[in-house]
């Protein structure tokens, strides 16, 4: 509880920073001669319990294929890299040639720091308030230039090393960089404070935005619907948001029949799922798949 309060207090600083910019995350493409360009991009979202990936047609801005691999059960002695190697054997499209390759690290080891308060020499200090850090940890950051802030996080170094062996060069970033950037863009010209909750397996993120300002970001572990509801209501109370009034939008692995949705709906008046119709127009996958894989499909 103490760490939660500290994290919430830290983000009161963020409230004072004006993020009134069109927040577009700039990416650097791999060097490709125009005559060799294939107009193909591969994005792989990685976690310790599996991976998902999709292929993009960059000429038409569409998603051409998508697959998901779960590491349901495996022996403790099994290396994560071996499980990824098996996935590469099972899915030949992972070995095809691409103009761009993006690796997306999905974990709850991240935070956001406004540019005026950011110093890349002290990355670990930003994370120590909401996660346990060690001297041996490797820290990285994603610059979100047009939002004047940075995502600070701990990537999966062993997984990055595996991809170096597979691809040689690639770009990587944190999943929450993509998530928050998209939510800030969507909040443009909306003066209302909105809470968005992104549900992952075992953890979820709470993001509060208002007209391209990031008012709060925090990540929580959970095991029950009651855990889920408690953190939402506690965060709302800290920010002075009235459960009878503020809009709560849910995204990720959730639908209206979920017990998590039903419990939130019981205590918060304005609950809905994030609208993914614009994203769905760029692919042939279902609304539920677009909601679950919102970050990957927006990469």
Indicate residue ranges for each PLM-predicted region:
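Hydrophobic/aromatic-enriched cytosolic interaction surfaces used to assemble or bind macromolecules
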Residues: 4-299
